[in-house]
């Protein structure tokens, strides 16, 4: 795969993008490629760091997390972004056809060459929303290419590659670990990645884990090439080849 590419990242919650792929997305943008982000829930079932339970509503948290998400996305530099309103904490039980249709819509609108999402294990956390995001991204990847699927959502588009987040460290992904095929050097972007994560102030309870992962991974983000319609070699330092 050569030339300018479009890469779509599909995740479950505001802050997933900063935790996992911010450095890679920044690097792709600096190299002249187009990046897009689809987040499936507003994160309104989580906690609000520094505030007592009952002192805020789910809708107030959703609005605040949306502001944080937009601020982080501005730093990362996504050309296109969508924040959907499927149930946080209940994505696994959301209507599968409707959620898949939303993913298909995004793929057909932005026409990515590459789609990235969580692995089937849910990025090591076994979080049901993360696992559901993997399933919906996988379904959308396939359905978007079919003229028979969701014709009301636009013309078919066949993305070339599907990547899952991965890690070479067993402590990060204790079960169903995806072996990394690609290691992206993001050392140059770690400062901005930190800034993006720090936008998510409501989720500061995860701050220690974020910095532990950052240190352990040594200036790299890892991916597993799950589907390759482009038939390129694995083991690359770029998602594009």
Segments from the language model and where they lie:
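Active-site rim/loop-helix segments in enzyme catalytic domains that contact anionic ligands
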Residues: 1-110
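Metal-dependent de-N-acetylase/amidase catalytic core
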Residues: 1-8, 80, 89, 93-241
């Amino acid at each position: 795969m050569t030339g300018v590419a479009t890469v779509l990242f599909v995740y479950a919650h505001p802050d997933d993008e900063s935790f996992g792929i911010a450095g890679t997305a920044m690097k792709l943008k600096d190299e002249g490629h187009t990046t897009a982000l689809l987040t499936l829930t507003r994160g309104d079932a989580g906690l609000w760091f520094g505030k007592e339970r009952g002192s805020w509503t789910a809708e107030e948290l959703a609005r605040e997390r949306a502001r944080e998400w937009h601020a982080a996305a501005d730093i990362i530099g996504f050309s296109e972004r969508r924040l959907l309103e499927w149930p946080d904490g209940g994505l696994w039980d959301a209507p599968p056809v409707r959620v898949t249709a939303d993913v298909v819509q995004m793929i057909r609108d932005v026409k990515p060459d590459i789609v990235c999402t969580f692995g089937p294990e849910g990025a090591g956390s076994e979080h049901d929303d993360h696992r559901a995001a993997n399933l919906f991204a996988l379904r959308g990847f396939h359905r978007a290419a079919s003229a028979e699927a969701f014709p009301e959502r636009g013309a078919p588009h066949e993305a070339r590659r599907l990547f899952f987040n991965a890690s070479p460290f067993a402590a990060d992904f204790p079960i169903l670990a995806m072996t990394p095929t690609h290691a992206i050097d993001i050392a140059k972007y770690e400062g901005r990645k930190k800034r993006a994560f720090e936008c998510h102030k409501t989720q500061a309870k995860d701050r220690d884990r974020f910095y532990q992962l950052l240190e352990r991974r040594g200036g790299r983000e890892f991916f597993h090439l799950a589907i390759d319609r482009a038939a390129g070699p694995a083991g690359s330092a770029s998602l594009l080849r």
